[in-house]
Amino acid sequence: RTADAGNAKFTSGVDAIRTILVDGFANISNEVGSSKIGNPNTLAKDGKTAEAVLQVESWYSWNSITDYSDNIISIKNGYAGRIGAIGDAAHANSISAYVKSRNADLDARMTAAIDGAYNAIKSMQSPFRNNLTGTKVDAAIEACADLTELTEGELLGAFRDAGDYDFTSILTQYADQVVTPTYKDMKEKAWMLYKAMQALQADNKSQAKVDAACAAWRAMRVPWEQ
């Protein structure tokens, strides 16, 4: 919110926006495509199946595809300036709205790239740990790479000529309606998981309590990944 000359980390609004794009969006899509999906895929193709499975995030819970697609949702939320689902409209004070006002085609392609990465991941056969190779996995890796390339290239470039544009409203919307609610949700769901685990510890022979703890863990994963 206070990205200006008096801020030790972000000396301008556009500096903060660029950090969101590179350290946020691009790093996330690259990690999902090249590391979370790509590393196990490469090992599996090399015949190192056992090692490949251990490289899969959440392999023990079969929650990997949900985790990866939720990572892409986090990019969508940041770009749209609000927490929501794929296909939801962007807020008026958002990175998307700014880009659209300057280059509607780029905004449409960025939105399509986010949607494309999400849908490609969701199209992979589940559970990922048992289906580490194949055309759908390759498509997901490629879609994430396309999103990373577009973000680091044209999208980042769109802010090089921002001049003295005041990004305060966009950054405030991002902080208040994306970042803060996400951490609040994470805190609340982490507490619910803690309580569920306490109940399970007190009676670890109860299947209902095992199921409740599993459900609480999965619920807590959502804000963590998004």
Model-predicted segments: where are they?
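Mature extracytoplasmic or organellar-lumen-exposed domains after removal of signal/transit peptides
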Residues: 1-226
